[in-house]
Structures are given as structure tokens and as C-alpha cells.
């Protein structure tokens, strides 16, 4: 019998997710000295308006318009922090980095392993009766989507492999909800107010184990306007309007990752793990 992924139950997966980014905790010193924002208006239209500290973003799309935000991880080095404390401008040479298995209590190590199993969570506030909210996650250059119709609450989950399923959600018209879209263990899931939204069939996009073990991230540096799925810009939030304007605010935005398993043969210097 071929090997299969041992998938975590929803409540276990939620408990094990690790925070990569939280918009509620900006770094004012970096912002003041020109460090790039983790979230960028990807269509370069200016439709997303950030609150001053970039804890939340608001957009109003006219009929037929769309607005997209994308996340990129810009990781300041110790030298960057030194320059910031000296009042020097930083950020012009900042480059997006992969999400890795960094742990704060192992801070001597910056994390050596790319993690493609990600989740995006936010408080979604709708001031409109219709429109569409689309979340996407990139994993090894494969882009997975969750599209929520504000008119009737139907969520459509679409894996890059073509597997599709629908879920009925309480997200309808005007209101506020906590939404989380996850791609963990090669399975897509949607949670609203911490409750899983069941689909008729699981959205599994199984990769073969032997291929999964050698799959690499896509390292193309992309900029606003690009449609290339890159692991250097792995999370997106898009608002689409059809026949009427749509006004939406997203706040408390978090990017999360699954824990990362490695086979280790021992330890080197403190905080360092050697892989098999």
C-alpha cells in the first residue's frame, strides 16, 4: 500500500499553527526608517488604504473593480536593526524571504527549512451586501484559493490540482467575522469564527510522497502586478466587485505556518540541529 500523509484533525492543526506575521504588532522603528510593508497593494491601484501603522486595510471597489493585497516576508538582519537605532534609513536593499521554521526560543538559528504549509487569518468586516472575497496560498509554486460570495455565504475551495468543493458559511452581506484559510498536510480548510466549515468531500490535493520530499519553492522575486505564483509572495487577499460597489476592511491579519518535522542525528552548537 502506498504511503500517505498522516493528516492532523482540524482542532489539532489549529493548536499547532505557528505565527509568522501578525499585523497587530508592527515595528514602528522599522516603519519610520523606510522598511517595506509586509502587505502591498498588488494591483498598484491604491484601492487598499492602510491605517497609519498598517494594522488594518480598507478598500472600496467600484462595480467591476478588484483590489489585491499580498504578503511578503522582509526579515531585518542584526545589521539592519543597528542602522535603524542609529537613525539611518533602511529598506532599499530589503528582499523578500521564504517562510522558514524559525522558533523564537531557538533564536540563535534563523530557521533552515522552508515551510510551504501556510494559513492566513483575519477579521473580515463587510459593509456591502454582495461582492467576493478571495484568499490564496502558494505552496511550491502551486496556488490554492478560497472564494467567498458575500451575497449568499457560499465558499468555494479550489486546489491547484483542480480539486474543488463548496461550503456554506455565515459570511453574508454586512457584518464581521474571523476567517482562516489553511493549506496544511496537502488539504485545504476554511474556518469561520474558529469553527470549521465542512465540505461534502475533503479538498485533498495529494502530492506523491517521493515527489513531495524533493519539491522546491519557487524563488522568483515578484512585484505588484505579477500573476506568477511565488513562494516569496505566498499569501493573498483579494476583493472583487461585480455589479455594485464593495467596501471591506481586513484587520488582525496573521500569517501562520505548520510545524516542520525533520530527522535529526544530534546537536551541534547550542540551538543548532543537524539534519540526517
Q: Model-derived features: where do they sit?
A:
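Extended hydrophobic leader/signal-anchor segments used for secretion and membrane insertion
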Residues: 1-276
Amino acid at each position: 500500500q502506498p504511503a500517505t500523509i498522516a493528516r492532523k484533525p482540524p482542532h489539532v492543526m489549529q493548536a499547532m499553527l505557528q505565527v509568522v506575521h501578525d499585523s497587530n504588532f508592527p515595528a514602528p522603528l522599522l516603519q519610520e526608517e523606510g522598511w517595506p510593508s509586509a502587505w502591498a497593494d498588488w494591483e498598484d491601484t491604491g484601492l487598499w488604504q492602510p491605517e497609519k501603522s498598517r494594522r488594518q486595510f480598507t478598500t472600496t471597489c467600484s462595480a467591476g473593480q478588484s483590489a489585491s493585497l499580498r504578503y511578503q516576508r522582509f526579515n531585518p538582519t542584526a545589521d539592519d536593526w543597528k542602522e535603524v537605532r542609529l537613525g539611518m534609513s533602511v529598506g532599499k536593499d530589503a528582499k523578500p524571504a521564504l517562510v522558514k521554521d524559525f522558533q523564537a526560543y531557538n533564536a540563535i538559528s534563523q530557521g533552515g527549512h522552508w515551510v510551504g504549509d501556510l494559513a492566513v487569518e483575519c477579521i473580515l468586516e463587510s459593509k456591502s451586501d454582495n461582492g467576493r472575497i478571495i484568499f490564496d496560498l502558494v505552496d511550491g509554486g502551486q496556488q490554492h484559493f478560497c472564494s467567498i460570495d458575500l451575497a449568499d455565504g457560499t465558499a468555494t475551495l479550489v486546489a491547484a490540482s483542480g480539486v474543488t468543493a463548496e461550503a456554506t458559511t455565515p459570511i453574508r452581506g454586512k457584518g464581521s467575522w474571523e476567517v482562516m484559510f489553511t493549506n496544511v498536510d496537502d488539504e485545504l480548510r476554511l474556518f469561520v469564527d474558529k469553527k470549521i466549515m465542512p465540505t461534502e468531500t475533503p479538498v485533498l490535493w495529494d502530492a506523491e510522497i517521493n515527489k513531495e520530499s524533493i519539491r522546491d519553492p519557487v524563488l522568483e522575486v515578484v512585484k505588484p502586478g505579477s500573476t506568477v505564483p511565488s513562494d516569496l509572495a505566498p499569501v493573498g487577499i483579494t476583493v472583487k466587485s461585480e455589479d455594485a460597489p464593495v467596501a471591506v476592511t481586513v484587520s488582525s491579519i496573521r500569517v501562520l505556518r505548520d510545524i516542520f518535522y525533520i530527522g535529526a542525528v544530534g546537536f551541534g552548537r547550542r540551538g543548532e540541529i543537524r539534519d540526517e
